[in-house]
């Protein structure tokens, strides 16, 4: 009888866990739709800015080198200092979501160590901060409650400090790493080499003439657009990471719910078997007692 009570207690416990994981799955599904929409919109806007930047950069570069006009285009032959901005979740229960990002950061740290590049980390998200603190790896800047609730102002504040350091020569390169949303069931690591700007001009190299007519202060226009470009790239990394996080958590909770269902089924079979054995034992004892009284 005590065995039956123990199995019944386990069934109740696993069933409660199943209800919890299923509820978390539904919450993540609802949040995913909102985060996915925000990621799509920010990506489209960033792409449009990229197109305009390509056009303006090409026009300016026809007359003078961009390296001399804007610090964002200055590229050193030998990179000595680099800043890595990486995004992880503030919460857990999302499968290998955070592990993939941390692995990508570690791989880049190892590569920089081999090349003797000094790296500074700017960490967004509690999970990544706790991991590198545990590893005794110094973190230059730590941002909590940002990856779980990203907004444009937060993104601007984060990237502005890094960009200022690049302009002032404190760092030679800025890279953003995050685990991005691919679809409902998968995510992918995205590494964005934000500074120095290299890709913008090359996209327009094939054009024979610019379609845009600018005022004399075209460098100022490009400078302002570049700042917006950096800000939206940072913002996209935050919202894209959040969408991927909800996707990973939804998948993890779905797997946990299915595992709980399977466990309840196993425990029910064990309960029925134990109950049948208990009844059989009782019947044998009754029959034996009756036989002994004859």
UniProtKB/Swiss-Prot annotation:
Q: Which SUPFAM superfamilies match?
A: ATP synthase (F1-ATPase), gamma subunit
* Keyword Oxidoreductase recorded: no
Q: Which InterPro entries match?
A: ATP_synth_F1_ATPase_gsu (IPR035968), ATP_synth_F1_gsu (IPR000131)
GO cellular component terms? plasma membrane; proton-transporting ATP synthase complex
Location comes to:
Cell inner membrane
Query: What domain of life does the UniProt record list for this protein's source?
Result: Bacteria
Q: Spell out the HAMAP family in the cross-references.
A: ATP_synth_gamma_bact (MF_00815)
Entry function = Produces ATP from ADP in the presence of a proton gradient across the membrane. The gamma chain is believed to be important in regulating ATPase activity and the flow of protons through the CF(0) complex.
Q: What is this protein called?
A: ATP synthase gamma chain
Q: Which organism is it from?
A: Campylobacter lari (strain RM2100 / D67 / ATCC BAA-1060)
Name the gene that codes for it.
atpG
